[in-house]
C-alpha cells in the first residue's frame, strides 16, 4: 500500500472530482473508503475541508497583514501562534508535523516547502469573498444570526483595502509557514 507521503505532487495536484465526492460522502455517513481512492482525492478533500471551516485556522488580522517581509522571524511566528485559539493552534501544529513528514520524502514526491506553504497559507487564512448586507434576513429576531449561506443577490463585495489586507496576510502566512517547515525551526 502506497503512503500519501510517497505520492508525487501530493497536495499540489487536485484529486478526481468523483473520488473527492466519494471521500466526502464516506466522511459524512461514516461508511468505509474505497481502497482504490487516490491519495490526491484525500488531499484535495482535506484542503477543501480546511478552506470551508466556519472560521479560518489562522484569522487574518491587520497585525498579520502589516508585517514587513524582513520582520517574519521565528520569534514573531511564536507570537502569532500564541494569539490564536488553542484548538486552531493544535490543528496548525498537527498539519505542520504531517507536512514535514511529506517533505522528508521530497525526493520521491517532488514536493517543496515553498509549494506546501503556498497551498496551505491560502486555506489556513481564507476569507469569504463576499459579506452579507445588513438586514437581509440573517437575523432570527432574537439578536442571533443564522449561520447560513447568503444568496448572491444579498451580498456585496468587500472594499479594496480589505482585499489588500487578505493578500498581504496570506503572503505573510506563507512566510510564517516556511519558517515552521524549515529544518532549522525547533519551536
Feature-to-residue mapping (PLM):
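Alpha-helical catalytic/interaction cores of small GTPase-regulatory modules
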Residues: 1-187
